Amino acid sequence: MYELIQAKGGSYYIESPAKVGLVQLGGDRVCLIDSGSDKDAGRKVRQHLDANGWHLTAIYNTHSNADHIGGNQYLQKQTGCAIYAPGMEQCVTCHTVLEPSLLYGGCPPKALRNKFLMAQESQAQLLTAEVLPEGWELLPLPGHFLDMVGFRTGDNVVYLADCLASRETLDKYGIAFLYDVGAYLETLERVKTMEAALFVPSHAAAAEHIAPLAQYNIDRTQEAAERIAGLCTGVTFDEVLAGVFKAYGLVMSLPQYALLGSTVKSYLSYLMDRGEVAAEAEDCRLIWRRV
């Protein structure tokens, strides 16, 4: 774990629970794509920098989930590097309580204000194509989270962030966290057509060909949508959520309630907007039915 692996040319990644990209910029200058899950991950990254005599100039965050920005604060304090995050992700990176607030749907209790859902705050600037290193391409990858992006480096290495879950993860859990199901499916259709020297997803193995895994994610997402639609039998949201937990053999906890609850609501929004389910008020309860 935390091994530095060369993808191609000056494009590397650090093998970790959420992969960290590292790209040489010329001379001793390097930048990162994301920073890992916490301060300890930041220290592991710093060890690679020191061992190679590299100077960190910037961190380009793909999105603001805690496991991708957790090393930001430590590395920024240690190196003075700039940090960039896209769109609404910039706000969450600077004000990290927004992530558990969004997931929970209100002021989050202390039990949700932990490093898994709420990273340390860092000073991030808005990420645009203009601030990227020369030869890079900014790749919009919405769906998993608010304004997630990926990057294509000058070595033709594509860093795909969280737009793909591994087969192992999907086979084990059946359903993955999503913010916007429709945008996610559209993103995966675009990813299927991409070509690169190497694709580096954050939570799946690096691969030269990404289309098979993208299609597997599409299939499992559509299966989850159909399963959730089938649970809408004139029941409340909590009953739908309980049905999802039971169907996938998951264990209820407060963090899982926030993560999966948010995901199920996103699926319900997707299904409602497609006219496949409807919500009606009955006896002071909101009831979900398949149309």
Regions found by a protein language model. Give the residues of each.
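A short catalytic or substrate-binding loop motif that flags glycine-/basic-rich loops and adjacent residues
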Residues: 14-16, 132, 141-145
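Short, flexible loop segments at the rims of nucleotide/cofactor-binding pockets, characterized by
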Residues: 8-13, 35-38, 59-62, 136-141, ...
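Active-site HxH/HxHxD metal-binding segment of metal-dependent hydrolases
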Residues: 11, 40-132
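Metallo-beta-lactamase
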Residues: 37, 137-223
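Conserved beta-strand hairpin/beta-sheet module of binuclear metal-dependent hydrolase folds
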Residues: 1-52, 150-162
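Divalent metal-coordination and catalytic microenvironments
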Residues: 10, 23, 34, 49, ...
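C-terminal regulatory/interaction regions
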Residues: 227-291
